[in-house]
């Protein structure tokens, strides 16, 4: 999503959550 690209720091955290299968 664009909002992830807009905030790399948050996107990195989201990536970790995605890897864990959180959200």
Curated annotation (Swiss-Prot):
Processed by the macrocyclase-peptidase enzyme POPB to yield a toxic cyclic heptapeptide. POPB first removes 10 residues from the N-terminus. Conformational trapping of the remaining peptide forces the enzyme to release this intermediate rather than proceed to macrocyclization. The enzyme rebinds the remaining peptide in a different conformation and catalyzes macrocyclization of the N-terminal 7 residues. There is a cross-link at residues 2-8 (Cyclopeptide (Ala-Pro)). There is a cross-link at residues 3-7 (2'-cysteinyl-6'-hydroxytryptophan sulfoxide (Trp-Cys)). Residues 1, 9-23 form a propeptide. InterPro entries: Amanitin/phalloidin. Keywords: Thioether bond, Toxin. GO terms for molecular function: toxin activity. Belongs to the MSDIN fungal toxin family. Major toxin that belongs to the bicyclic heptapeptides called phallotoxins. Although structurally related to amatoxins, phallotoxins have a different mode of action, which is the stabilization of F-actin. Phallotoxins are poisonous when administered parenterally, but not orally because of poor absorption. This is Phallacidin proprotein.
């Amino acid at each position: 999503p664009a909002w992830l690209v807009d905030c790399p720091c948050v996107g990195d955290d989201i990536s970790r959550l995605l890897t864990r299968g959180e959200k």
